[in-house]
């Protein structure tokens, strides 16, 4: 690629070596050449991107350049852009188009970003491999038989394959950082509340965060400068001043205190990833940082806590998709016919039970007939059964169970208490160190289909990322090389920091990538 990062493209634009239209055309050619194999995009807005690029070029000629003019950006398909599809990778919303722009889209468009298309993702952002999408799996651009990670796998794959300068993703339990690590890009999860969630289709509202995936720390900082800040449309956005994240990127790590959480380097971590992360830590030590071990004792409960909190919130958020107000609607006549057939079956079984003198079974069948669904309830059930995939159904059922009478205190309330303990672990650690260095994932990318039959093993892939979401902390992953046992497939290193200190993470990330 001639201009792989936006920083490169901006220099070329300023020097008159290229134009916004030429940049968009170059990426469209690459999408046409590569995306049939990768499946990173669910839709591409060729005409819209080219028209906007021409407009930005005309503005530059008039002496009115925008700060992000020339940034060709892909957007995860759970973030709303007015008039664009917003499917969330689900049959439930396969034909739905957004009626408004997310706040991040408003801010990026005003700054001159060019939206080239929507990227594929795990259904409703629920997954760690991008295999649950209604539009088919995304493939890792470095090795198509491997997963790109999830749920923002399409965004990570698009950036890694050079199909755009950068992409937006959402991170609920690692969904920006894990695919960024698997695809070899930078992935930033800002502090909860740093970036508005308005226009992000909700998965778990207390965990969801929008963040950029890029090819450099500088590009991530440039995008965060625009999308960060309080928003009156999102009551959870924080009234905290936004610094210039590009300042200090080259300051290095001298004098910083970096912590290595012992729980993140324990059993279960791939040996080569351990070695590669340790080598980077040694480099940081040589560059003037002070490195020490720290403990986050409640880390072992992170995955269980996350999957209770996230699924409980998901079961509530996804209740809105009923096929009536919006979402996939089952065929009404087929629903009525199926309902009538079921009633006839129950009547036949009831008659048989009475004929055999089985009063207990007859009473049960009679109660079922009395409680049989109305046509409207049956339509809800059929629409949701057809519209949601298996993983989404699994999480809705788990969340509904955790919130049900008799189990709320036992599971959900206890998970919230453990969540508080996890946050306190980080607060104590940051009294002694400035930032934490960890692996992003316990393993390198795995093959497509390798873990689809074992949800627990898939969930455990999030073990190093979910705690940052539970605590609301910022997290950054940067690529640190290729895994020796899976040649060509990247490994990521994660940096975690105190609330609202994204600038520190980007500074450390830039030092690692030098």
Swiss-Prot record:
| Stated family | Belongs to the amidase family. GatA subfamily.
User: GO CC annotations?
Assistant: glutamyl-tRNA(Gln) amidotransferase complex
Molecular-function annotations in GO = ATP binding; glutaminyl-tRNA synthase (glutamine-hydrolyzing) activity
Q: What class of enzyme is it?
A: ligase
Give the gene symbol.
gatA
> Tell me, how does this one assemble?
Heterotrimer of A, B and C subunits.
Q: Can you tell me which residues form the catalytic site?
A: 76, 151, 175
The coiled-coil segments of this chain are none
E.C. designation(s): 6.3.5.7
Question: What is this protein identified as?
Answer: Glutamyl-tRNA(Gln) amidotransferase subunit A
Give the domain of life.
Answer: Bacteria
Keyword Transport attached: no
Function statement: Allows the formation of correctly charged Gln-tRNA(Gln) through the transamidation of misacylated Glu-tRNA(Gln) in organisms which lack glutaminyl-tRNA synthetase. The reaction takes place in the presence of glutamine and ATP through an activated gamma-phospho-Glu-tRNA(Gln).
Catalytic activity reported = L-glutamyl-tRNA(Gln) + L-glutamine + ATP + H2O = L-glutaminyl-tRNA(Gln) + L-glutamate + ADP + phosphate + H(+)
GO terms in the biological process aspect are:
translation
Which keywords does the record carry? ATP-binding, Ligase, Nucleotide-binding, Protein biosynthesis
């Amino acid at each position: 690629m001639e201009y792989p990062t936006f920083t490169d493209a901006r220099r070329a634009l300023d020097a008159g070596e290229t134009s916004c239209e030429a940049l968009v055309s170059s990426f469209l050619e690459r999408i046409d050449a590569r995306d049939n194999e990768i499946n990173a995009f669910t839709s591409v807005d060729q005409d819209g991107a080219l028209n906007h690029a021409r407009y930005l070029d005309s503005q530059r000629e008039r002496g009115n350049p925008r700060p992000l003019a020339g940034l060709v950006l892909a957007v995860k398909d759970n973030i709303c852009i007015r008039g664009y599809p917003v499917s969330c990778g689900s049959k439930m919303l396969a034909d739905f188009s957004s009626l408004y722009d997310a706040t991040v889209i408003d801010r990026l468009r005003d700054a001159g970003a060019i939206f080239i298309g929507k990227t594929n993702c795990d259904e409703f952002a629920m997954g760690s491999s991008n295999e649950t999408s209604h539009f088919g799996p995304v493939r890792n651009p470095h090795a198509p038989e491997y997963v790109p990670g999830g749920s923002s796998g399409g965004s990570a794959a698009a950036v890694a394959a050079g199909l755009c300068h950068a992409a937006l993703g959402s991170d609920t339990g690692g969904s920006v950082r894990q695919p960024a690590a698997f695809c070899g890009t930078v992935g930033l999860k800002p502090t909860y509340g740093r970036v508005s969630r308005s226009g992000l289709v909700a998965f778990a509202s207390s965990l969801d965060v929008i963040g950029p995936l890029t090819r450099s720390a500088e590009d991530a900082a440039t995008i965060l400068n625009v999308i960060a800040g309080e928003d009156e449309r999102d009551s959870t956005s924080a009234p905290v001043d936004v610094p210039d994240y590009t300042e200090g990127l080259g300051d290095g790590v001298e004098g910083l205190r970096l912590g290595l959480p012992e729980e993140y380097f324990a059993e279960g971590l791939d040996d080569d990833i351990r070695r590669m992360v340790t080598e980077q830590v040694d480099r940081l030590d040589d560059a003037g940082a002070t490195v020490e071990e720290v403990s986050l004792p409640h880390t072992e409960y992170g995955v269980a806590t996350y999957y209770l909190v996230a699924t409980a919130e998901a079961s509530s958020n996804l209740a809105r998709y009923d096929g009536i107000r919006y979402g996939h609607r089952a065929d009404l006549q087929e629903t009525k016919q199926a309902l009538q057939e079921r009633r006839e079956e129950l009547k036949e079984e009831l008659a048989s039970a009475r004929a055999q003198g089985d009063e207990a079974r007859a009473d049960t069948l009679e109660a079922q007939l009395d409680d049989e669904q109305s046509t409207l309830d049956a339509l809800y059930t059929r629409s949701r059964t057809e519209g949601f995939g298996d993983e989404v159904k699994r999480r809705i059922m788990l969340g509904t169970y955790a919130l049900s009478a008799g189990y709320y205190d036992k599971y959900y309330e206890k998970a919230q208490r453990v969540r508080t303990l996890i946050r306190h672990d980080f607060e104590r650690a940051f009294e002694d160190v400035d930032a934490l260095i960890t692996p992003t994932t316990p393993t390198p990318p795995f093959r497509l289909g390798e873990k689809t039959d074992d949800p627990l093993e898939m969930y455990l892939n999030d073990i190093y990322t979910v705690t940052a979401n539970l605590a609301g902390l910022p997290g950054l992953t940067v690529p640190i090389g290729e895994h020796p046992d899976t040649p060509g497939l990247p490994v990521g290193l994660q940096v975690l920091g105190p609330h609202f200190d994204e600038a520190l993470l980007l500074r450390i990330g830039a030092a690692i990538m030098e």
